[in-house]
Amino acid sequence: MTYDKRAATYHRYKVSLATVNGRVQARYVLPRELDGTPYARYVLDRRWRFSTSKLVYDGDRFWLHAVMKRHYTASKAVDESGSDTHSGDSTRVLGVDLNVDGYSAVTSAGGFHGNADHLNHRREQFESLRAELQQTGTRSAHRRMKQRRGNEWRWFDQYAHDVANGIVADAVQVGATHVAFERLTHIRRRISKLPKFQQWFFRRVQEYAEYKLKEYGIECRQVNPRNTSRACSRTDCDCVSAANREGKTFRCTACGYEVNADYNAAKNIGFALLNDLSDSADIPASHTRSLGRARSQLALMSGTLTPAGGFASREWESTDKPTASAVGG
């Protein structure tokens, strides 16, 4: 059952729900320590507001899945003369790289969101507990396993929401018109042993980011990620080599450019979309063309960059990112 704002009234520690027998008040079940919980992150933060919610019954208990919304204020990038670089006919792209280890999502604006290693660890914990309950084989164990399965997917779903929210925040802050993701089909080919869970998680993050970004008029697109992890993202370098990347460090063997490998990939994914939007089939992977008369820009952590190499300094601050020395330029 879905509730809108008329049928559900949210308070700090309880919610009032309309039923066929009148309104029912239910208090939130909260842990002793609130730090780091979705309740502390969204309910206690007055910048977030309740939207719609869905009442779900798992055979044992009722759960209320609430959607939170927040309005962001977009920042502008200015060039050295102080002029706004984002005009009505311009296209500004935010590139996003999704990962199975390290940070779950990295954006070309320097946003580092989620912890894929922690996500994988939680997944292993859930699977281990489920295996123990299956071995027990009792009715009580079966009931607990069913309950844990519901808790498990709610946790992962909330985690996908959190990562998507980080991407949305970056996109709005830099005034992006488009957000570029890697096509999921290519992710599966690139990582042949990618578990179904990771495929589900990547798809969920993209879906949540897409519907959240629609509110701001920002369009999501998917691109072919060919060579995005191997190519140097500097606009004056055409080097594409597997030797450029070692773990989470990208070091170009041609020009010496050194940067976080996932950040480099996010930039290349953004450039790939700029190339796609140009409607030219013969644009090389070195991303050296723009979109004709329309001004095309890639949103970076330090400003905006055109495919031709034109740079404008920033007026925004990225969130949740490592130090500049760890990220690079």
Model-predicted regions and their roles:
Residues H65-F202, D282-G329:
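Substrate-contacting helices/loops that form the catalytic groove of nucleic-acid
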Residues L34-S51, G59-A74, Y208, E219-R221:
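Short helix-coil boundary/hinge micro-motifs
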Residues R12-V24, V29-L30, H65-Y72, S108-A109, ...:
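Secondary-structure transition/turn motif
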Residues R49-S51, V163-I167, I218, D238-C239:
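Glycine-rich, charged/polar anion/phosphate-binding loops
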Residues H71, R203, E207-G329:
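Positively charged, low-complexity nucleic-acid-binding target-recognition regions
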Residues T52-K54, G95, A242, E258:
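Short, surface-exposed charged micro-motifs
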Residues D58, T107-G111, T235-D236, C255:
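Short acidic-glycine loop/turn motifs at beta-strand connectors
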Residues M1-D58:
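Acidic carboxylate diad motif detector
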